[in-house]
């Protein structure tokens, strides 16, 4: 994922996050054997400027959920598609 795409996705996800959570965000229906390893997702987030990346956990909607600090120093909760690391929502 290119940084420009990530920035656009972060902006869109910020706007969509409350709606997504209210609607019961479903990130994937793919088998867990196809999911990225949490360590790979953590590395990807760090490469895109996030710091203080916390433990990566799966939620009921099959999203990876992680708390991290963004490039501006704000603490965020990120909802990621575990199959490819795409940002699905952010609070």
Q: Where do the PLM segments sit?
A:
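Short beta-strand segments that buttress and anchor functional surface loops
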Residues: 55, 66-69
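Glycine-centered tight beta-turn/hairpin loop motif at sheet-sheet or coil-to-beta transitions
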Residues: 71-73
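Cleaved targeting-peptide boundary
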Residues: 20-30
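Conserved histidines in hydrophobic membrane contexts and catalytic metal-binding motifs
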Residues: 64-67, 79-80
């Amino acid at each position: 994922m290119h940084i420009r795409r990530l920035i656009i996705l972060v902006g869109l996800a910020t706007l969509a996050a409350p709606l997504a959570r209210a609607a019961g965000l479903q990130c994937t229906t793919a088998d867990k054997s196809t999911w990225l390893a949490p360590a790979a997702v953590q590395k990807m987030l760090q490469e895109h400027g996030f710091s203080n990346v916390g433990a990566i956990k799966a939620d009921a909607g099959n999203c990876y959920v992680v708390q991290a600090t963004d490039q501006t120093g704000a603490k965020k909760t990120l909802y990621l598609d575990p199959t490819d690391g795409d940002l699905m929502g952010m609070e």
